[in-house]
Structure formats: structure tokens, C-alpha cells
């Protein structure tokens, strides 16, 4: 009887000790949870995203630093610029693919990352405060889940000067909180994007294309500046790097990459052979063929498609610049910047091509590489204000050409 009583006492003591241990563990758990929650409140950062592979802490730090700066105003005072929302290590002597996009059009980065194997720099324009916030969330989500974004992409943000971008509140995770992979981020972006008519922002803010171009190519000795909805041919970056490694003599020469456009239903051609087959049946045509044939005609597409096939990328023939040619090109040396007074539609690229010509650059067309725009450019796909903007920029272009005479008084070339 006494032994039974002793056993029962020992059992109750053991049970009491176990209950006390459980209680202590629960208190410890609640304390840690409270501390973590307080850290979230303090940090005001992207803790609603799941843990990701290496460099995520660096991404968060860089985003925080870029946004905390408050940005800087552009020369006009109309736009606020946040440099280095995302940063990557870029060799200044590498060939950079520089592009620009509205927030909706960031979905095209997926195709660029697949085709362009080198460094890429993108300037993003957010027309509203909500878009600016979405851009910061996207920057983190893409770099968090896409290793190529972390390794190869620099991202900058531009918004109207009256807005300031800020780090999103972790209590409001939004559309991208539960995504787990790079493909999921791009799929989600494609679903929430609102494809619209070219340059129709739905606000009274002008799209600052030349400011965005300059920002994207800033600091690069060699850059191919393209629109985000264009895709380069496979291996173009490797071919350009090999050319650069062999010659290192690009100063004063603009290497023209022929540009085409394709019906949207078609798969993007990877090489010149595939492109030429589509070109011959009318599924691919010169860029801007339906809007401004002379704008690309000097490229001499008939000559280019009939060049003999070669394994190495090289300049094939020289083309004297003539108005209104606005080629896409890679150049080294002191390339003139894009004039940031040109906004919205009209004369924003030709003005820079014109200055290249006056500054003494020569144009040589590459034999194998090319660019393809997704879809045929058609007049009906532009916003109603296109013609008014074009006329405004046409007057500005005339003024710009007069200014070039004063800027290059010893140049025999004119536009």
C-alpha cells in the first residue's frame, strides 16, 4: 500500500514537471514570436516573402538604400529618379543590353533574359504612386526568385516628381506574397498587367523614353539600347563579346543590328535562317514597315537577307546615315546621350541617331545578329494623341538640328 502511494506520488511529480516544461516552452515560443513580430514592425520590409537562395539579404539592403535616398530630380524637375533599385556587378567593358518599360511591360524581361546571356539594365517608369509601390515589390520578387535577375540585371525606377516610392508595408503583402518561383512571378505579372495602347498611360504624365534610355545605359562603355518588347537573336551577346575581345576598336563606329517585327502568333526566330524563312513568306517584315518605311530603309534589308551565311558575327557593309534613319546599334567611345526633352511619341530616337552622324560616327550593319519586335506595328495600336505629339516633337527636332550646328561647329555633316 505504501509502495503504491509512493509510485503515485512519483507519477504526479513527473506529470507536474512535464506540464511546467510545456508551459515554459510555450512562453519561450510566444516571446520569440513577439520579438519577430516587433522586428517586422521595425524593419518595415519584405518579410512576407518566403526565404530564398543567396544574395536576398543584399537585395533587401540595396532596395532599402535606394528607396531611402528619396531619389533625385531629373534636369527638368518633372521626374524623380531612383538609381540602382537592383544592382549587379557589371564589367564596364562588357556589352550591356539597355532597355526601358512601364510597370505592365516588365513581363517582357523573361524573354530578354532567355536570349541575352550578358548583363541587362532596365529603367522602369511608374506613372502613379501605386505603380511605384508595385515596381518595388516586383523588383524584390523577381530578384528573390530569379537567379538570373540577381546575377545579371540592374533596375532603376522613374516616377513623377510629386511621388516618392517607399518600401511596402509587410502587413500589406499584395499580389506577389505567396509566389515561390521565378516562373510564378512572371505568370502573375502577366495576369495582373493591363496591356494598353502604346504610350497611353491613362494619366496626364508623359512617358520620358529618352530619360529612361540614358538611365539604363549609364556607365556602360558599350550598350545595345532597345525597346523591352524586342527580342535579340540567339547568341548575339556572345558574338558581340568575341568581336570586342578581338578588336577593341569600336570607337567612332556604330554597329547596326537589323530590326524586324513579327506577327504575334508566330514563335520568335532564334537564328538568321529561321528569320529569313519567315521574312520570305511575309510573317516577318522590317521594323516600322507599316508606319515609317524610310525610318529603317537605309539598313538595306534585301541586301542583308541575301548575305552568305557565316558562323562569326562581323560588320558586313557600311551605310551612310540619312534622315530619317533611326537604327538600333552598339557603339563604343563617347556616344551622345539621348535628348531628354523628347517625350512620348516621335523623334526621340532619330534625334540621337542624327547627333551620332554629326559627331562623326559611321554606321556598319552586322551580318548575322538581329532584333525582332513582338507584333506588327500598326497605326491603330497607338493612342489618339500620337499625331499631336509627333507634331510637337517635329518642331523640337528642327530646333535640335540647329543646336547641333553650334555644338559641332567643325563638323561637315548635317542632318
Curated annotation (Swiss-Prot):
Q: Which residues are glycosylated?
A: 204, 300
Cytoplasmic compartment spans: 1-8
UniProt keywords, alphabetically: Glycoprotein, Glycosyltransferase, Golgi apparatus, Manganese, Membrane, Metal-binding, Signal-anchor, Transferase, Transmembrane, Transmembrane helix
- Name the GO terms of the biological process aspect: axon guidance; protein O-linked mannosylation
- Pathway, according to UniProt? Protein modification; protein glycosylation
GO terms assigned for molecular function? glucuronosyltransferase activity; metal ion binding
Q: Which cofactor does it need?
A: Mn(2+)
Membrane topology term reads: Single-pass type II membrane protein
Main localization (coarse): Golgi
Q: Name one GO cellular component term.
A: Golgi apparatus
Q: Which reaction does it catalyse?
A: 3-O-[beta-D-Xyl-(1->4)-Rib-ol-P-Rib-ol-P-3-beta-D-GalNAc-(1->3)-beta-D-GlcNAc-(1->4)-(O-6-P-alpha-D-Man)]-Thr-[protein] + UDP-alpha-D-glucuronate = 3-O-[beta-D-GlcA-(1->3)-beta-D-Xyl-(1->4)-Rib-ol-P-Rib-ol-P-3-beta-D-GalNAc-(1->3)-beta-D-GlcNAc-(1->4)-(O-6-P-alpha-D-Man)]-Thr-[protein] + UDP + H(+)
Cellular localization per UniProt: Golgi apparatus membrane
Question: What parts of the sequence cross the membrane?
Answer: 9-36
Per its UniProt record, what InterPro entries does this chain match?
B4GAT1
What is the top-level taxon of the source organism?
A: Eukaryota
Q: EC?
A: 2.4.1.-
Q: What class of enzyme is it?
A: transferase
**In this UniProt entry, which residues form the Lumenal topological domain(s)?**
37-415
Q: Where does Mn(2+) bind?
A: 227, 229
Q: Which family does it belong to?
A: Belongs to the glycosyltransferase 49 family.
Subunit structure and binding partners: Interacts with LARGE1 and LARGE2.
User: Its function?
Assistant: Beta-1,4-glucuronyltransferase involved in O-mannosylation of alpha-dystroglycan (DAG1). Transfers a glucuronic acid (GlcA) residue onto a xylose (Xyl) acceptor to produce the glucuronyl-beta-1,4-xylose-beta disaccharide primer, which is further elongated by LARGE1, during synthesis of phosphorylated O-mannosyl glycan. Phosphorylated O-mannosyl glycan is a carbohydrate structure present in alpha-dystroglycan (DAG1), which is required for binding laminin G-like domain-containing extracellular proteins with high affinity.
Q: State the name under which the record lists this protein.
A: Beta-1,4-glucuronyltransferase 1
What organism is this sequence from? Pongo abelii (Sumatran orangutan)
* Designated gene of the protein: B4GAT1
Amino acid at each position: 500500500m505504501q509502495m503504491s502511494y509512493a509510485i503515485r506520488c512519483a507519477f504526479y511529480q513527473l506529470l507536474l514537471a512535464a506540464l511546467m516544461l510545456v508551459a515554459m516552452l510555450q512562453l519561450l515560443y510566444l516571446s520569440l514570436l513577439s520579438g519577430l513580430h516587433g522586428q517586422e514592425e521595425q524593419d518595415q520590409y519584405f518579410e512576407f516573402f518566403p526565404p530564398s537562395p543567396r544574395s536576398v539579404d543584399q537585395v533587401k539592403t540595396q532596395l532599402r538604400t535606394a528607396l531611402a535616398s528619396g531619389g533625385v530630380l531629373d534636369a527638368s524637375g518633372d521626374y524623380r529618379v531612383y538609381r540602382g533599385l537592383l544592382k549587379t556587378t557589371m564589367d564596364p567593358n562588357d556589352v550591356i543590353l539597355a532597355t526601358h518599360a512601364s510597370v505592365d511591360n516588365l513581363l517582357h524581361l523573361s524573354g530578354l533574359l532567355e536570349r541575352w546571356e550578358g548583363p541587362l539594365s532596365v529603367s522602369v517608369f511608374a506613372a502613379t504612386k501605386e505603380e511605384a509601390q508595385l515596381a518595388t515589390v516586383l523588383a524584390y520578387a523577381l530578384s528573390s526568385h530569379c537567379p538570373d535577375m540577381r546575377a545579371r540585371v540592374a533596375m532603376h525606377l522613374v516616377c513623377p516628381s510629386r511621388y516618392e516610392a517607399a518600401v511596402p508595408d509587410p502587413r500589406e503583402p499584395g499580389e506577389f506574397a505567396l509566389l515561390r518561383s521565378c516562373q510564378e512571378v512572371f505568370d502573375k505579372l502577366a495576369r495582373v498587367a493591363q496591356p494598353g495602347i502604346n504610350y497611353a498611360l491613362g494619366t496626364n504624365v508623359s512617358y520620358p523614353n529618352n530619360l529612361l534610355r540614358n538611365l539604363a545605359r549609364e556607365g556602360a562603355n558599350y550598350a545595345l539600347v532597345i525597346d523591352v518588347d524586342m527580342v535579340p537573336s540567339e547568341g548575339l551577346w556572345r558574338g558581340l563579346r568575341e568581336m570586342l575581345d578581338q578588336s577593341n576598336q569600336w570607337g567612332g563606329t556604330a554597329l547596326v543590328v537589323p530590326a524586324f517585327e513579327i506577327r504575334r502568333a508566330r514563335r520568335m526566330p532564334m537564328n538568321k535562317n529561321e528569320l529569313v524563312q519567315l521574312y520570305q513568306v511575309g510573317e516577318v517584315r522590317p521594323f516600322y514597315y507599316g508606319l515609317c518605311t524610310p525610318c529603317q530603309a537605309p539598313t538595306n534589308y534585301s541586301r542583308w537577307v541575301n548575305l552568305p551565311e557565316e558562323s562569326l558575327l562581323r560588320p558586313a557593309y557600311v551605310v551612310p546615315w540619312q534622315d530619317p534613319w533611326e537604327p538600333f546599334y552598339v557603339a563604343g567611345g563617347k556616344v551622345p546621350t539621348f535628348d531628354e526633352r523628347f517625350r512620348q511619341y516621335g523623334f526621340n530616337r532619330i534625334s540621337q541617331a542624327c547627333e551620332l552622324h554629326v559627331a562623326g560616327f559611321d554606321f556598319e550593319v552586322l551580318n548575322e545578329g538581329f532584333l525582332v519586335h513582338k507584333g506588327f506595328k500598326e497605326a491603330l495600336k497607338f493612342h489618339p494623341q500620337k499625331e499631336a505629339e509627333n507634331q510637337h516633337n517635329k518642331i523640337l527636332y528642327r530646333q535640335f538640328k540647329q543646336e547641333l550646328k553650334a555644338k559641332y561647329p567643325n563638323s561637315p555633316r548635317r542632318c
